[in-house]
Amino acid sequence: MIEADRLISAGTTLPEDVADRAIRPKLLEEYVGQPQVRSQMEIFIKAAKLRGDALDHLLIFGPPGLGKTTLANIVANEMGVNLRTTSGPVLEKAGDLAAMLTNLEPHDVLFIDEIHRLSPVVEEVLYPAMEDYQLDIMIGEGPAARSIKIDLPPFTLIGATTRAGSLTSPLRDRFGIVQRLEFYQVPDLQYIVSRSARFMGLEMSDDGALEVARRARGTPRIANRLLRRVRDFAEVKHDGTISADIAAQALDMLNVDAEGFDYMDRKLLLAVIDKFFGGPVGLDNLAAAIGEERETIEDVLEPYLIQQGFLQRTPRGRMATVRAWNHFGITPPEMP
């Protein structure tokens, strides 16, 4: 799988991405973009604090790299409580989840990333914990086994997923608040890039930040990653100052084009156009044609291409739009 090698893949977290934690917003007033999410969460958090209650359980979903973990941290900071972090694949046994739940303080936030990957056994334990703040666990084995109930303090579960459709209905229905994160607009990304540049001590023009933002695929994680590579280019090839021209040169060298596409995006679109005459083409055939897994196409490649109007998902398969044909300078076929 080539996803891990892609500079603009938001689905993989590089070691240097961890350094971004220092520049992530800590409070809602610092949170840029997602205006509807921000305004709603501001009300929900204030209401919970006025009542002295734990915030309702929160499900955050959307493409990778849009700030689901950041939003979970902000919620905990705004509520003035601790944040405990884990992920679906890590919670292999019911005891793993029980250990985390019994260590929570009142109103604490438990953040489970990739919550769609919870095992059915762990999920069953989660239901009464979310609904009644109770933990039902089995002690012993065989005929001597017995169930005991443990009362839990009121807490907030925040689940994050890129695949909301993979959640079971019983789990999804137990979240009182559901927020979808959308791709960011270019002006918001420009602000994020400029802010990150200041934190990194870089001299960067507004146009330079705009150039990076335009090619960041609507994703803050990618914007910050591109910024670091542009910084490297500016320091080695120039005097370290990042202008629009320097940013464009650096990103062209990295094969990230003006639409934010890299070689995998272009490979996918060209496969649909050249090998399947623009489509429709089934997902399995497309995955085989470009040597990728269907999950990577669905979760990583497709969302941005569809959102930007380059790819269309139809009942018969994927189709390249006229905009995709024009992007490569190829004349689209006449419509019947």
Swiss-Prot record:
Record region (Head domain (RuvB-H)): 258-336
MF GO annotations: ATP binding; ATP hydrolysis activity; four-way junction DNA binding; four-way junction helicase activity
Region (Small ATPAse domain (RuvB-S)): 185-255
Effect of loss of the gene: Significantly reduced survival of cells expressing DNA ADP-ribosyl transferase (darT) mutant G49D.
Reaction catalyzed: ATP + H2O = ADP + phosphate + H(+)
Subcellular location: Cytoplasm
The protein's Enzyme Commission number: 3.6.4.-
Residues reported to bind Mg(2+): 69
GO cellular component: cytoplasm; Holliday junction resolvase complex
Record-listed ATP binding positions: 23-24, 65, 68-70, 131-133, 174, 184, 221
Protein family per UniProt: Belongs to the RuvB family.
Protein name as it appears in the record: Holliday junction branch migration complex subunit RuvB
Native source organism of the sequence: Escherichia coli O127:H6 (strain E2348/69 / EPEC)
Encoding gene, per UniProt annotation: ruvB
